[in-house]
Design a protein with these regions (language model features):
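N-terminal secretory signal peptides that target proteins for export/translocation
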Residues: 1-6
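Extracytoplasmic/secreted envelope proteins and their assembly/folding machinery
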Residues: 51, 65, 97-100, 113-116, ...
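Acidic/His/Gly-enriched intrinsically disordered linker/tail segments
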Residues: 72-75, 162, 229-245, 252, ...
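Soluble non-cytosolic domains of exported or imported proteins
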Residues: 90, 94, 106, 110, ...
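Juxtacatalytic substrate-recognition/specificity segment
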Residues: 163-281, 382-392
Length: 406
């Protein structure tokens, strides 16, 4: 349950279904072939059984699925590539090069470079790989670019003591600077991409999620001491005003990555990309991040697995230890502000109850309750997430809400 930095403004989010036509500009990397043979170019940002949403410039055009014969989309290729990655070992250079070639063929140049870097870690003297990655030979050494300098490949990781010399690599949806070494950089990028697709799989059926067309900046520091100063010993946070995720490396992994990546995805997918009009309530902001983090099993670096339900044992333990007369009421949870989550007093119980309420409504066995919660999400994203909206929507189910704490 990572703390958020003090005095950060709450970010704005808007569900795609409520978004204006103007959106993030996207290069025309995709093709949609109609049944009459006409071919349209743009970026496929969403498709389902009923329609294909094609972004041309900054305008999203809905095309009825019955009019579409073929769709050639980067998003689909990226999902396929990530599936292949899940079954491959990063210690197998042959497998990594096979993935790199697949990425090349499918128009995913950033991923192609990532897999070649994985291969190079196993074959550090491979001339062809060094040349493909743009490294330069200097005598018997190979020099790689770190910031505005070139340093020997075998000493590059050690340069991370200075964040200015951090590795900087791209993936389809993320732009990462990492001072914790090349392998951690690669694993973190693939972890983030896995989380991106898991986020869409987890919530895409209920909330219309569009493809992200702008990379999210992420900074991973060598340790907490290297991080920019914030109030308290904060190990991870997302800053909406900089549209950047900040975290550090702990035990070889990026700390609280899923929680903060959720904040980043919400902001970039809805607020930043679609010029949001509504403010997501603080309880929902944090609860959503905790719910998604609980739905990920992250045992293998770079390969998160999406679970059917959100699992947060620490929150369950916290709830079990709170006396009944000390539990916050549903009304109080709905009225929690960002500062309430930042305060150390009762912090664990606030996160636990927010997560429990989200989980109770999102995963309820009653389809009507789940549908009502989706309705609330849409209204909250449109700037109508006040507790009065929640109470009105859930009035028929009010007596059931305290069951969330059980």
């Amino acid at each position: 349950m990572p703390a958020r930095p003090a005095q950060l403004p709450p970010f704005l989010v808007c569900l795609a279904a409520l978004a204006p036509a103007m959106a993030q500009s996207a290069p025309p990397r995709d093709r949609v072939v109609l049944v009459d043979g006409k071919e349209l170019r743009g970026r496929v940002v969403h498709e389902d059984a009923n329609e294909v949403l094609l972004r041309v410039g900054t305008t999203d055009k809905a095309i009825a699925r019955k009019l579409v014969r073929e769709v050639h989309a980067v998003a689909a290729h990226h999902r396929e590539l990530l599936q292949q990655w899940r079954g491959s070992s990063p210690e197998d250079p042959v497998a990594m090069l096979r993935l790199a070639r697949q990425a090349d063929e499918q128009g995913l140049p950033h991923e192609a470079r990532l897999f070649r870097w994985y291969a190079l870690l196993q074959r550090p003297d491979d001339v062809e790989l060094h040349n493909a990655l743009g490294n330069r030979r200097a005598g018997k050494q190979w020099l790689v670019a770190l910031g505005d300098k070139r340093v020997p490949f075998d000493r590059a990781d050690a340069m991370g003591v200075d964040f200015a010399a951090a590795w900087r690599l791209r993936s389809e949806h993320f732009d990462l600077r990492c001072a914790a070494g090349l392998r951690t950089t690669l694993d973190t990028l693939l972890e983030l991409e896995g989380q991106y697709h898991a986020f869409h799989a987890a919530y895409g059926d209920a909330v219309r999620l569009l493809e992200l067309c702008e990379p999210i900046p992420v900074h991973v520091y060598r340790d907490r001491a290297q991080m920019p100063q914030q109030s308290g010993a904060i190990g991870a946070y997302y800053k909406p005003d900089e549209a950047t995720l900040f975290t550090c490396c702990e035990n070889g992994r990026a700390y609280a990555l899923a929680h903060e990546a959720t904040h980043a995805l919400l902001h970039h997918t809805f607020g930043r990309a679609l010029r949001a009009k509504g403010e997501l309530p603080a309880w929902l902001d944090e609860a959503w991040a905790e719910h998604f983090a609980g739905r990920l099993q992250t045992r293998v670096p770079g390969k998160p697995v999406l679970l059917d339900r959100s699992v947060q044992p620490a929150h369950r333990t916290t709830l079990a230890q709170i006396a009944a007369d000390e539990l916050l009421t549903v009304q109080r949870v709905l009225n929690l502000q960002q500062g309430d989550f930042q305060a150390s007093t009762g912090q664990a119980s606030k996160y636990a109850q927010a997560w429990a309420l989200f989980t109770f409504l999102c995963e309820h066995d009653d389809a009507a309750i789940r549908a009502t919660f989706v309705d609330y999400l849409r209204q909250a994203a449109a700037g109508k997430g006040q507790s009065s909206t929640f109470r009105k929507l859930f009035a028929p189910h009010e007596r059931l809400l305290p069951d969330a704490w059980r």
